[in-house]
Amino acid sequence: MQDYVSQLLYAINNYNPDDSESVNVLRDLVCWVSDNEMLKNDKVIAELLYIASQKMRVFGYNILNNFTEEPIPSTGYLSNISGSSITNLYRSKVYSNNILDKSQQEVVDLFQNLTVRRLLVSAPTSYGKTFLMREIVFLNKDRYHNILLVFPTVALLLENARMMQKFVSDNALNYQIIKTVDVALDDETNYIFVFTPERALQLIAAFPDLRIDFFFFDEVYKIDEDYCSDGTEEDEDKSSSRNLRKSKAEVSTQEFLNEDRGKTFRIALYLLSKTVSEYYLAGPNLAQEHFGIGMLRFLSSNQITVKEINFEPTLRIAVNAYNTRIEEKMPKCLPDSKNTGLIPHGAKVNDRIKEVVSYIDNKKYGKTLLYCNSPRKAAEYSVKLAGKMDKEIYDSFPDNFKMFIQHIQREYDIDHSVDEWSFIQVLKKGFGIHHGKLPKYIQQEILEQFNKGTFDIMFCTSTIVEGVNTDAQNMIILNASKGGEKLTPFDIKNIKGRAGRYYHCFVGRVFYMGNIY
């Protein structure tokens, strides 16, 4: 067995927060060892994992490992240290049992200490950007009477409205949560509006005299039509030439809708930035040197401070699954992977999907998302996979989910053909489907059941990789496009980021069914 004690000791002693290589080595070791129950049951290794988390100030590792704040009892090999003095510095002001990571605390402190409290935070997926928003709101609860939170989708709006309702209730705050513009407002009441950009514009139009003290704008990259994820002039020239060659008739509906929504995002942010003094903007994987001219001008003219965080707390393993072998690409500090699987030569895509899903199941790697470029593809792939699987796990479903399926059968029983509807058949086989063409309440129920563990495979489109949170450990990228457009490096980063959510798992695996770069 590999000498993880020596490796951890060496990585801890050579850890330098300003050296990305030493940071990544210690992260990879901590995540890899923590993901192995047998390894971390060793008392020396457990103590080293605790010390590594404390030294990195990435406290989510200890929380996920169920390590207490007090040091693990000394084994005699290592000096005993007290962790409480460290963790108390990073304790959440909202929930005292939560500990902020060092970089998270830096974001909160930076906002609080700014002369002009306007901040753009770029951080990896699942970093906790909305969690930090709640910290900021709590610290300023006596100053902020009306708060506006803007999220890009209705699914995110509903998820965050529930979180904010709990936040207000748990802390006995004097706020009323509002999700729709069709309400009567009272000057004596404090409000937290949780809206999409479209609803934010409706609010501004309906209540022009309403004073908003603070706003939060999520997925802010959507407002920059010039944003280029790889930042090369050559790619910008290619993109411009491609668009010029297209006639109006050739521009897809999806492209038109994306452009239209982009304008809505920009107008909403522009109007809010002109009337609100303090705000916090957030987005994933944004690199300032790749911002378009419009975004740079917006940041400068509004005196917005930019905070970039590049550290990924989860070990993410790339897995090639597009040849005849499934091969995991391991970091140098970890042993070469013996976890390989074979795919029959010339296997068609649906057979290949079955092999990869079976590989994940046999390795007990956990829950899996399968990214598809359209609802049609999600339906096609899921039906094919369901047809290749012998099991039907409907009888093992919890009663509330059985009732949900029965409700769908009653509600959508058109010409008594609902039993033939592929969606029902796929659900009964234990696979979820999530895309924007499904009614919102169905999307929400499917997502909740996936997170509860009712089923562990879900076919999805871009609707679930643009901010909706799951606890999936694996992502299989089936298509290299989104709608009719090729995935950009920025899109790929966001999709990859859905495998291995921080605070839920240590290791995420991304399976590539084709060479997407």
Could you tell me what each predicted segment is?
Residues 1-517:
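N-terminal helicase ATP-binding lobe
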